[in-house]
Amino acid sequence: MIGFRKGIFLAIILTIAGCEKKQSTVQTQLERGKYLVTVGGCHDCHTPKIMGSGGVPAPDEKRLLSGHPEKERYPRWAPTDMQERNAMALTNSMLTAWSGPWGVSFAINLTPDKATGIGEWSEQHFTDAMRTGKHQGQPNGRDILPPMPWFNYKIMSDDDLKAMWAYLRSIPAIQNQVPLPQPPKK
């Protein structure tokens, strides 16, 4: 009977240890994803800004990675801007909308909101988008426009892209319908 109890105790300990290891692996992946999203500069364009101290824009913690606010104004660019303003591109005050020779691009909602974010995307959609520069990674999808440096992400490892995906799936969903890109004015 003592051997049976020791066996049960050992099984419980091994089960708990296995669960803790699995939990720490998931946590490590989320931490890695958060790190990559942060150093990758995702907040620079995908998080709306509020005015911080000293007039420096700061990320709006209530709208992390929610993209261009749906009712926010956006910049307009004309070919003469290159000569008259010496400007290749213009941006809004939140850095969530950019205009240039490609038209107007808007930082998409990266939160897991199913209606307006990437909640309906799969991990494969995300990794394919980062590798191909096509929205949702669809071969016939629209191009991911400047200033999104998707070409820098295409060289990342599958594990790193999966970690980013896991982190993006873990953040709060924010409903925010980002406008579709606009073609250049002729």
Q: Where are the language model's segments positioned?
A:
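The canonical Cys-X-X-Cys-His
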Residues: 33, 39-49, 126, 164, ...
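Flexible coil segments in periplasmic/lumen-exposed cytochrome c-class electron-transfer proteins
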Residues: 20, 47-106, 135-186
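Electrostatic cytochrome c docking/interface patches
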Residues: 21-38, 50-55, 75-76, 116
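Second-shell loop/turn segments in exported
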Residues: 111-118, 149-154
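Glycine-rich, acidic and aromatic/proline-enriched surface loops and short helix-turn segments
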Residues: 128-136
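Stable alpha-helical elements in mature extracytoplasmic
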Residues: 29-32, 41, 106, 122, ...
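C-terminal motif of bacterial Sec signal peptides marking the signal peptidase cleavage site
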Residues: 15-18
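Sec-dependent signal peptide recognition
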Residues: 3-10
